[in-house]
Amino acid sequence: VQDFAFIDRIPGRKILLKGNHDYWWTTAAKFYKFCEENGFSNQFILNNNCYYYENVAITGTRGWFFEEDAALGSHNDKIFKRELIRLETSLKAAGEAKEIYCFLHYPPRYRGYQCREILDLFQKYGVKLCCYGHLHGDSHRLALEGEFEGVLYRLAAADYINFTPIRLL
């Protein structure tokens, strides 16, 4: 609750998405109920939707990361396919936005791994910026920062940005 209270006190609307440790937040309804019960009024989630800020569509989903869990096979494949559907639903919701920013928890490209399906969706919908997290500690040095295939990538993991929000617009 303290973390959400801190976030709520920051001026402006906050748009959040689920990470790999957010087991308590199983549905959007549970998240919004939690916010209501705690008096948090300016926190929203990316969940099969998008939000607009001026001419920018803010899209995204958790994503998925195969490299570490390849042995899990079909379980991973089911989750991955669901995340692709969620991402495309969010990107479609952007409509004719002038610019599309996409937020993922997992990196779509890391070390020798790249998620071609996600990268192809970025191309199909004209994503200009992708912010992602998940990488911590020594893995920062292998993160994709900068442009790749016309998309600007930014690592926004909390410890990488020194627990300080970064301005994107």
Residue ranges and their predicted role:
Residues 1, 20-28, 50-52, 65-69, ...:
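Active-site environment of divalent metal-dependent phosphoester hydrolases
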Residues 1-13, 22-23, 82-99, 168:
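N-terminal active-site segment of His-dependent metallophosphoesterases
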Residues 1-53, 114-127, 149-151, 155-157:
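Core catalytic region of metal-dependent phosphoesterases/phosphodiesterases
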Residues 6-10, 33-40, 61-72, 131-152:
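Short secondary-structure transition/capping segments
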Residues 9, 13, 62, 82, ...:
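Arginine residue identity/basic-tract feature
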Residues 14, 19, 58, 87, ...:
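Divalent metal-coordination and catalytic microenvironments
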Residues 27-117, 121:
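Conserved catalytic scaffold of divalent metal-dependent phosphoesterases
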Residues 151-169:
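Short, basic/aromatic-enriched C-terminal tail that caps enzymatic domains
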